[in-house]
Amino acid sequence: MTVTTLGHPLAPVFAAAPLSPPTHRDIWWLIIVKTLGVFAFLVLATLFMIWAERRVVARMQQRIGPNRVGPFGLLQSLADGLKLALKEDIVPTLADKAVFILAPVISATPAFLAFAVIPFGPTVSIAGHHTNLQLTDLPVAVLFVLAMSSLGVYGIVLAGWSSGSPYPLLGGVRSAAQVVSYEIAMGLSFVGVFLYSGSLSTSDIVAAQAHRWGILWAGVSFAVYAIAMVGETNRAPFDLPEGETEIVGGFHTEYTSLKFALFYLAEYINMVTVSALMTTLFLGGWRAPWPLSLWSQANVGWWPVLWFLIKLGIVLFVFIWLRGTLPRFRYDQFMQFGWKVLIPVNLTWILVEAAIRVVNVSNWRVWVIPFAIFLALVAVGTYVADLVRQRSEVGDGGPILGPALVPNPDSPYPIPPLPGQRPLVGVLEARTDDFPVGSAAEPRNGGDGDA
């Protein structure tokens, strides 16, 4: 497929590789079977991921993990689900009952819908009918996944607002800010893939990776997406909406029984979905890795499903690995990283990749390459200048506490300094005249008190 614009010379920039075969029109019972198959896969993947996460993190912490229910503890997640179903369903007195009950459903439903456009494999024969191993495909399938992941945050925000408690509200507000920040970086990381494949369809993107995976020609986009998908799913080290040490349990503090289980289910399904999307966009999708791709039957029949699941499992393991090894980010660090690092780097990479695509199909090498290099240098220089400015502020001691913020040495509740501020030891004497006589902020004992 080639996108043409009235014979414009830039039209071949978006020329794609040979696309996948046309989607077969499925009969009604085949659609039902595929729908139930996707639903069952997501539920089983969630149960397995919970078990795997508990076992792997336990090994990292020199523990054993669940090993009582079923062989190797494989049925422990199912037992926990039954336990949650039998627990008392409590609705707080101050909660908005209708919204409180609806919020988990709003969070879980888009998580299931987003997986509908992920291709598991090529065209296969089921009971004599040829069908793609994909529930459905859309011309804008990747944007559909992005939209569904955005809708899920509405359930989290409504859960925090309707609980009638300050901690869930803080968790909901954090989640909204987090999604707004990292959804932009995630969406921009898709642009590099679109430039190369020439399509927004997941099947066409997999077909465009027949000879070279997306990670090779969009490595920067892959790195940005890998970081953004962790922030998008509220997973460690970006699990700020449910930070136990700060806001108890975050947005689901007041939830119990099946409503809590729905939030848990939505979180893990979102993990599976963003991991499957990474596999589809950057890791060749269901196509066999080298050297297995040299086998003529590697990308035919049901074998591609195995390659897809192996890649998916590797990406999901990274989620577990991050949770067991990295501490939680501070909120200001997290937001600053998204807006000042990921988005500028992604925008610069899009310009560079677009310039490279233009160079490949035209004779504009004279000015396109220097222009791309100039943009890259400007982006790097801006980032370095920002780092130097921050370090110089820290080296100088940062801003001095004003009179209204000077702690009272006699108070049993001292005010902790904010990031970048320095104690006023040795400075109070020089600033004694700035304080009103007899005020609470007036320094005691000749200015020897600690700030």
From Swiss-Prot:
- Please report a single Pfam family linked to this protein: NADHdh
| Gene Ontology MF terms | NADH dehydrogenase activity; oxidoreductase activity, acting on NAD(P)H, quinone or similar compound as acceptor; quinone binding
- Fetch the InterPro entries from UniProt: NADH_UbQ_OxRdtase_su1/FPO, NADH_UbQ_OxRdtase_su1_CS
| Membrane topology summary | Multi-pass membrane protein
- Stated EC number for the protein is 7.1.1.-
- Transmembrane portions of the chain: 30-50, 98-118, 138-158, 176-196, 213-233, 262-282, 302-322, 336-356, 368-388
Entry keywords, A to Z: Cell membrane, Membrane, NAD, Quinone, Translocase, Transmembrane, Transmembrane helix, Ubiquinone
Known role: NDH-1 shuttles electrons from NADH, via FMN and iron-sulfur (Fe-S) centers, to quinones in the respiratory chain. The immediate electron acceptor for the enzyme in this species is believed to be ubiquinone. Couples the redox reaction to proton translocation (for every two electrons transferred, four hydrogen ions are translocated across the cytoplasmic membrane), and thus conserves the redox energy in a proton gradient. This subunit may bind ubiquinone.
Q: What name is this protein filed under? A: NADH-quinone oxidoreductase subunit H
What gene name does this entry carry?
A: nuoH
